[in-house]
């Protein structure tokens, strides 16, 4: 039996979290009684889920969260079509693809976007997803008078095309087991920003990704984002090859997983 670790913190907060922490501590000690192999999507996820004894055993493996990298290759034709359809021409487009929940920290993202908008009125925000915090998110957008600059697209199946249409990927999560959305963004050649220490360093496989501490203010996040965006010239076409070379393409990782299972 394989047990797989996919996150590095609890989704539940408040009183519920106490129960989940107790059960997590209890089951962390018991899991080795039942499992034959232990997989994790990152070292952070493995440290959260498994005891040291498990992580030092030959049956413990990091299995890369992989993507079909060719699907996410930057497409200039789709970029032009989507920017026209979404009225993003002449805009600096920030995108986030995530569930609207506590983990993804989207209220903080709105604060960062507000600071960027103060720097340059061309900024536009596209949020792809849905979730329990949608109402709070809409209220905050309204309170900051950002309604005309933020598009909530809901759940979509055309993520690769939307990434091609964007200029910046912003992902200030409170915690992540890996952060596969960041991998997709890098495959599309998007300048990307995420949270330091709570998002695994293993997802930063290109020079596109910058980590910023959540202890920094929205002003400081905005300064870093704006500085990089205005000073870098990026060839977005080359990054799918880098994803493959680093072992994060689905075909490569599927073969590696099969070799473990065949042993």
Locate the predicted segments by residue.
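A short helix/loop element that forms part of the nucleotide-sugar donor recognition site in Leloir-type
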Residues: 73-87
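Aromatic "clamp/platform" in nucleotide-sugar-dependent glycosyltransferases that forms part
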Residues: 155, 174
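A charged, aromatic-enriched C-terminal amphipathic alpha-helix characteristic of glycosyltransferases
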Residues: 233-263
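A conserved mid-protein helix/loop that constitutes part of the nucleotide-sugar donor-binding site
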Residues: 92-115, 132-138
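Short hydrophobic beta-strand element within catalytic cores of glycosyltransferases
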Residues: 191-196, 201
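A short, active-site helix/loop in glycosyltransferases that binds the activated sugar's phosphate group
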Residues: 32-72
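Nucleotide-activated donor-binding/catalytic signature segment of Leloir-type glycosyltransferases, i.e.
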Residues: 138-154
């Amino acid at each position: 039996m394989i047990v797989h670790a996919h996150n590095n913190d609890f989704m539940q907060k408040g009183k519920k979290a106490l129960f989940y922490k107790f059960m997590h501590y209890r089951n962390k000690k018991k899991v080795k009684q039942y499992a034959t192999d232990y997989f994790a999507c990152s070292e952070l996820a493995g440290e959260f889920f498994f005891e040291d004894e498990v992580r030092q055993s030959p049956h413990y493996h990091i299995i890369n969260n992989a993507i079909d990298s060719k699907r996410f290759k930057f497409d200039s034709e789709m970029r032009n079509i989507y920017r026209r359809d979404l009225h993003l021409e002449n805009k600096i487009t920030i995108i986030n693809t995530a569930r609207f929940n506590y983990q993804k920290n989207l209220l903080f993202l709105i604060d960062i976007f507000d600071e960027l908008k103060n720097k340059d009125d061309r900024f536009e925000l596209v949020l792809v997803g849905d979730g329990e915090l949608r109402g709070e998110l809409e209220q905050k957008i309204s309170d900051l008078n950002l309604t005309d600059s933020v598009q909530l697209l809901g759940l979509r199946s055309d993520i690769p095309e939307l990434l091609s249409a964007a200029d910046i990927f912003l992902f200030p999560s409170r915690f992540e087991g890996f952060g596969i959305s960041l991998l997709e963004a890098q495959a599309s050649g998007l300048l990307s920003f995420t949270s330091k220490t709570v998002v695994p360093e293993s997802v930063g496989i290109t020079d596109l990704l910058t980590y910023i501490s959540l202890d920094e203010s929205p002003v400081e996040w905005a300064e870093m984002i704006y500085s990089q965006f205005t000073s870098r010239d990026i060839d977005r076409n080359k990054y799918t090859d880098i994803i493959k070379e680093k072992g994060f393409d689905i075909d490569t990782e599927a073969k590696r997983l099969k070799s473990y299972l065949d042993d």
